[in-house]
Amino acid sequence: MEWADKYRPKRIEDLIVSEEIRQKIQSWIDAWEEGSPKKRALILYGVQGSGKTSAAYAIAGTFGLPVVEMNASEQRNRESMKATALMASLYADLGASDFRKPSKVILIDEADNIFESNNPKRGGDTGGVYELSKIVKETRNPVIITMNDFYEFRKKNYSSEVINNSESIEFKPYARRLDRNYNEFKKNVRNRIKWIINQEGFSLPDDIINSIIDKNAPDIRSIINDVEAAAVSQSSISQNNDRDTVESVYYLVDKAFKKNYDDTLKSIYGSDVDSDYFINWVEENLPSKTDDISDLNSAYEQLSFADHILWAIERKRHFDLMTFPMEIAGGLAYYIENPKHEYVKFHSPSYINSMSRSKERRHALNAVSLKIGLLLHMSGVESLNYVWFYRLMFKVNAGFRDTVYERLNLTQGEEAVLES
């Protein structure tokens, strides 16, 4: 799991925001918990990367409620807003102990991009914001609305109904050295970053941390991504640790091809192997366990399902469900009716194929983008847009490739990312 997701704020106390913003959020939460909110919706607006969505999830964590998230794209037109958002916001869960209390937090992300079109072929109409205005007036559950461009949203029909019935909080970018809050922000971010690095067992010089913060502020997610890349690129995993990981996944793969599911689950729950790494190993070694076409088809369908679930978990950030894809892949033996009975030694996936879906490749790509960013005087996130250029140049100009390798001091994994 990437550090930015692993250490996402869980409560409003974890947010790195000004005390003014924190107090406004807390007042809105208190009003809900007292059962008498005058404004049932909360609008969080500000530039992209300012922490609005993270704040929404932290607010839900403070409530102790799950999040129902809707991204306001082309699929969020009038009918879908009416069928999904209105139902979710008006009615408590069937299993709720008290129907008068909120049961969830409704998150409508990027509301300034709510799709509105009179063209029925594109599935749109002009009532998306109107339906949203009804939701914020009538909801029985807290509604959080995020938007990048508050003033663009104000131009939409019925937007005033939404705004007037919502508490609005601006996530302002700091004016760097001219703003005393920026120094406080930088101090808090630096302390959080040092804590994360220590938790992960890495170390990083203060000058690199400060440089990363200055280049990415106020986008904390980008800061953490670049810090992770820098920390990993400066550290080496010992041969013993590599061996332990291989032995652990080898053991799990062996279990997956044996019909003792309870034993397999115990091994999965006691392992620290990543889900994508495990699935990659199982997929690579499946043909060695059966050559029956029907068996292979059934087994690969299950692996595809596990991979899809893994994608959904990462997309929705439900990381407490990370073992679910492994549970699916771990039962593969029950889809193989005609197994090979001879002993076969499992082998690891090919280097590039393994990296393409593993944490190792993500770390390598992050490390490369950070190094390119330092070379070009931009953030690692921005420099990702230029990786394709380096890949192309390496293919047509060996001299350029050798110079870049020397300047960036790339590891073998980082070279593989640029040559793939």
UniProtKB/Swiss-Prot annotation:
GO BP, one annotated term: DNA replication
Positions contributing to ATP binding: G46, V47, Q48, G49, S50, G51, K52, T53
Molecular function terms from GO: ATP binding; ATP hydrolysis activity; DNA clamp loader activity
Pfam family, one: AAA
UniProt entry keywords in alphabetical sequence: ATP-binding, DNA replication, Nucleotide-binding
Its biological purpose: Part of the RFC clamp loader complex which loads the PCNA sliding clamp onto DNA.
Oligomer and partners: Heteromultimer composed of small subunits (RfcS) and large subunits (RfcL).
Family in the record: Belongs to the activator 1 small subunits family. RfcL subfamily.
Protein name: Replication factor C large subunit
Gene encoding the protein: rfcL
